[in-house]
Amino acid sequence: MTIAALSSLPSYDGAELVIPAPGAGPGNWAGAASAVLVDGVFWLTWRNRRPLSDGRGVTVSVARSTDGVRFETVTEVHRDQFGCESLERPVLVPLPEGGWRLYLSCATWDSKHWWVDSLTADTVPGLPEGNRQVIHPGSDAVAVKDPVIAVDPVTQTWQMWLCCHPLTEPGHEDRMTTRYLTSTDGLEWHDGGEVLAGRPGRWDARGARVTTVVSRDPLVILYDGRADAESNWYETTGVARWDGSRLVADAEAAPVTSPHSDGAFRYASAVPLPDGGTRYYVEAAREDGAHDLITLVR
């Protein structure tokens, strides 16, 4: 059995709408979400994105729910707070010592550069006024964004899978790989090197971005990939397993796609449930070309 045969993998079948796109048509996206279940409450954070001409990723919202489908917005962060052109994938993490941290992906104005920032506060409503700290500044050579962050339940080591875009070749900044980092506090990180990249000639040739952890033993992840530059923003979902030194994509599995418009099925976030199932949140294309945030249980 390949890892693609895992019964917990998501698909578009049976999905429910959680957050609709902020408008109709291409470029309007609700998604790039991450979610966590804490004391019976689902906490969800996502970016609200409009077309390039209307501001791109203007806000990040944080909401709560007791059923995982119907959410009440608790707070919101605006791009102006960070002086950035756009916001992309956020991550909300409950801190082991108490309190919350919101990680944000921020785009530098008039460039292809991205960095990862953060806000830390005692409560979720207090996050917009929380303590700000840059987590990873990126560089002139590399843009960094869309972190996946977890705390290992055994070692208590913080883990990050970070999407990296090389900026050294103009016109090719959409290429992406994933690096693995560790930390003792979630603020200062050690870079463990590249762990996932696209495969020449395959559906993920242009890049591979880890999106969520499906299981830990063995380590199985979902990732976004695409074949070419023209598919930028329309990634689809694949699966990979840790082989002891890096993540290896399932060689037999086709990517999971939306049946609508550009086919995007990306930024999956997996939430383990008490009954052994998994609730997924995914950004998926709809018929008019917009992207909704959907959820499903496997």
Q: PLM ranges: what are they?
A:
Residues 1-85, 93-206, 214-263, 272-298:
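Beta-rich carbohydrate-recognition and catalytic domains
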Residues 88:
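A basic- and aromatic-enriched beta-loop-alpha substructure that forms the phosphate/nucleotide-
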Residues 209:
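Predominantly extracellular/luminal carbohydrate-interaction, adhesion, and secreted-enzyme modules
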Residues 266-268:
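Short glycine-rich, acidic/polar surface loops and turns
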